[in-house]
Amino acid sequence: MPRYRLTVEYDGSDYVGWQRQDNGPSVQGAIEKAVLSLTRETVSIRGAGRTDSGVHARGQVAHLDLTREWKSYTLQNALNAHLALAGERVSILDVAEAPGDFDARFSAIRRHYLYRIISRRSPLALEARRAWWVPKPLDHDAMHEAAQRLVGHHDFTTFRSAHCQATSPLRTLDRLDVTRAGELIEIRATAQSFLHNQIRSFAGSLKLVGEGKWTPDDLQAALEARDRKACGPVAPPDGLYFMRVDY
């Protein structure tokens, strides 16, 4: 059976997340329905990351197996047509044939995420579900300085969900940068893999630094506590984007 690699963009606002669930529409389910409508095949696709409800993607990667061969551009266009017809906020950006041993999740060597904060007094209208609105001024330089305390190999118990199913809290964070362009603050994170709610936990804690409520030393102390209770507030899902996967 030929295997295909899909690069997927989606607005996660109205989905329960990437993974198929019984309590509402999922991105995985939307694509699987489009495949069924197109090919009459029931497939199970695997994504590189299981984004939560409200989290967006600009470069999620998934793979699926089909019984017949398709030209990549034909499959891409056809799936997009079926997704659009169903009113889904999902777009297939690219389709490529993949080797049989390619796995969107387990073949990944690096994942890239972006968290967007808009720091201004006025509420968001156009980007209300695409960024975290923070009405207070934030010191992005202090946030970036603090973020560097988290880079490297650490026990990230403080910054993972209490419901995280990973067997180990140890992860290697390759990059955590905070930059600003006008009212937009961007937090970019790179690692081979992340724990559940890890980036949103980073963002919420870094916001405390930006407000002057925490210092970089406070953030490091939270990391070293290895205690979920030491974490700052978890940032909302609206500002989080799954940007890219390296293989």
UniProtKB/Swiss-Prot annotation:
Binding site residues for substrate: 113
UniProt GO BP: tRNA pseudouridine synthesis
Catalytic activity line of the entry: uridine(38/39/40) in tRNA = pseudouridine(38/39/40) in tRNA
InterPro entries linked: PsdUridine_synth_cat_dom_sf, PsdUridine_synth_TruA, PsdUridine_synth_TruA_a/b_dom, PsdUridine_synth_TruA_C, TruA/RsuA/RluB/E/F_N
Tagged with keyword Metal-binding: no
Active-site residues per Swiss-Prot or TrEMBL entry: 52
Keywords linked to the UniProt accession: Isomerase, tRNA processing
Origin superkingdom: Bacteria
Single Gene Ontology MF annotation: RNA binding
Enzyme Commission designation: 5.4.99.12
Subunit structure: Homodimer.
Family according to the record: Belongs to the tRNA pseudouridine synthase TruA family.
HAMAP family for this protein: TruA
NCBIfam families the record matches: hisT_truA
Function recorded in the entry: Formation of pseudouridine at positions 38, 39 and 40 in the anticodon stem and loop of transfer RNAs.
Name recorded for this polypeptide: tRNA pseudouridine synthase A
